[in-house]
Amino acid sequence: NLYRRGIYTHWQRMFLHPSLLAFDAPSREECTVERPRSNTPQQALVLLNDPTYVEAARVFAARMIREGGKTSSQRLAWSYLQVLSRKIEPFEEKLLGSLLEKHLASYRANMADRDSLSKVGMKAAPADLDAAELAAYTSIARVILNLHETITRQ
């Protein structure tokens, strides 16, 4: 039951799940017809640091590597189509490509950071993928999944 959708999340009366609280979940004390829209820095921090979202980003990063193509450019384009349903703009590709190279160099040099990122969550990191590459793509997936365009419905 770990990977069920949020609609099946157990709600406690006295203690609301922190992720739901950050995203303005209504209290159970009264009926709510329409939820307010908000976009706060706290929500961005939850999406970047909550183990649930870090694990989701790592799983998506593994898909980027396996299904996205052979080159980083193909993988970035694939990820944008999957998450945002649109093509990646050239400036976005350039920006994310340079960020990917920076993170790849960092994770190749720092084994402790790479290993700690691979242990977040309940799902084990795939053993058949390069750990540094997976960690770097996880960082990119976290950026893409935290875009305003991704989390805010228009």
Where are these regions (language model features)?
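C-terminal structured "cap/appendage" subdomains that terminate the fold
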Residues: 65-138
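An acidic, gly/pro-interrupted, aromatic-rich
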Residues: 1-74, 123-154
